[in-house]
Amino acid sequence: MAKGGFPGFGGNINNLVKQAQKMQRDMERVQEELKEKTVEASAGGGAVTVVATGRKDIKEITIKPEVVDPDDVEMLQDLILAAVNEALRKADEMVTAEISKITGGLGGIPGLF
């Protein structure tokens, strides 16, 4: 075996370890940043708007008064569900984009978020 390395690791395991440690620090930083970053989604032409963080916490739900109809609560529920699901999908996309900046597009790393 070559000095300072293992076969298949480009000859220097120390560089690989340093890169992994940097990636871990970067991931921790991104996790903290995602607590503050938000995405917004709406349904019903803006009748219901939802704001979620990158950690998938719902921060705000706004409902326009004109869509509140006591005789059609089901429609309002559907609008809220659609807006929340869209906000969570956008949060997932944001997380994926942030992670790919760190991993260089190597794909998702299971269990990070």
From Swiss-Prot:
Organism per entry: Acetivibrio thermocellus (strain ATCC 27405 / DSM 1237 / JCM 9322 / NBRC 103400 / NCIMB 10682 / NRRL B-4536 / VPI 7372)
Keyword DNA-binding: yes
Chief site of localization: cytoplasm
Similarity comment: family membership: Belongs to the YbaB/EbfC family.
Keywords: Cytoplasm, DNA-binding
Name the UniProt record assigns to this protein: Nucleoid-associated protein Cthe_2143
Pfam families found in the cross-reference section: YbaB_DNA_bd
Protein function: Binds to DNA and alters its conformation. May be involved in regulation of gene expression, nucleoid organization and DNA protection.
MF GO annotations: DNA binding
Oligomeric and partner information: Homodimer.
InterPro entries, A to Z: YbaB-like_sf (IPR036894), YbaB/EbfC (IPR004401)
Cellular component, GO, one term: bacterial nucleoid
Subcellular location(s) per record: Cytoplasm, Nucleoid
